[in-house]
Amino acid sequence: MGMILKRAAVLALAMLAAMGASARTISAAEYKERMIAGWIGQIAGVVWGAPTEFKFKGVIAPDSALREWVPSMINEGFDQDDLYVEMTFIETLDKYGLTVDIRQAGIDFANTRYKLWCANAAGRTNLRKGIAPPDSSHPAFNRYATAIDYQIEADFSGLISPGCPQRVLELGNLFGRLMNYGDGVYGGQFVGGMYAEAFFETNRVRIVEAGLACIPQESLYAQMVRDMLKWYRNDPKDWKLAWRCAKAKWRENSDYQKLSSGDIDVKINGAMVLLGFLWGGGDPENTIRIAARGGYDSDCNPSSAAGVLFTSLGLKNIPAKYYTALDRSKKFSFTAYDFPSLIEVCERLARKVVLKEGGKIRKDSNGKEIFIIPQNAPAPDGYDIAWAPVRPEGCRYTSEERARIRAK
């Protein structure tokens, strides 16, 4: 046994050396286990917070507003738009590959039949009118350009990109620009970046810092993240004090409300995600409860916070009450996926991402698959200012493309 372990270690070192730059490794089995945990966290967060959604705006919800968790609640997630919308993007990637262009992504989104709101609804309406992306998200055509929408849907981008933050950015530019602009896109890239890091990191501050590295540092969203980190370092116990600080600056101060989407704005809701993720102390229930009690979009916010946390913890470290009752045969609304097939497609895409980002997939001496992933720093694009945007590009679908948009 000792000789086998030694050979495995030598093989791993040789593969790392062959990569040249520093690399991180994760077994395929551990990747899958953490990715499953991330989806469980998303589902648990959204269903637990759902009864409070937008009922508490600018006030802290009482603890009594949240039900006690019972295992069967996990099956309330199959009809949640917070989950099935991002599965449209997963299906597009699986069908057309990682190099799918934004126009095709827009056609697929335009053809969806589920009900949408805010930036998602405006973006899809624009697409159906023939306004091709990225113009479909431009503030000239979309009054909700800085709303929370892509932040809600970006979980998939990190779950299929373990340790690959640049791929998270590219997926954000591909799908986030269908409906969001500027900070509206950056919120999703930030969340996706946290997921990508959570496969390798348990320190919550470092996970947040990894997400922060994925977005333009001069953006308002980045300023909000730095504020939340500062307030956490100043007082990691009093989440209600941090909530009051976030509300005062990121919801009530007019200097930070330029082209704001109000209570659905990505920045105040991103602050509530971090409220739960940081002040929750790494505890699943505390994380969800705090993020939900922060109010505003209080099902989406605990979903994002719990999804990242559960990915970091891994399935083995999550209380079984969150997943033992999951119906594995039921399909998510408007999708072809039940839970096992969702996990299967995400694992398939993750393998492609690892290779596309310059990584390798090898077997050790025991036949166990190992993902070897180069540590490449993300390179965010320039800052798109939503209240002073560049001119629309004049993107329009051709008549042939419009003929492929069947929904009206």
Name every feature range the model reports, one short phrase each:
Residues 8-18:
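Bacterial N-terminal signal peptides
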Residues 23-49:
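Mature N-terminal segment immediately following signal peptide/propeptide cleavage
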Residues 26, 31, 127, 136-145, ...:
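Accessory "access/gating" subregions that flank catalytic or transport cores
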Residues 35-36, 88, 105, 133-137, ...:
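Mature, well-folded catalytic/scaffold domains that follow N-terminal targeting or propeptide regions
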Residues 48, 55, 59-67, 180-183, ...:
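Catalytic phosphate/nucleotide-handling subdomain of diverse soluble enzymes
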Residues 50-87, 102-120:
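Active-site-surrounding "flap" and adjacent substrate/cofactor-binding loops of secreted or lumenal enzymes
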Residues 97-152, 157-160:
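Extracytoplasmic mature domains of secreted/periplasmic and thylakoid-lumen proteins
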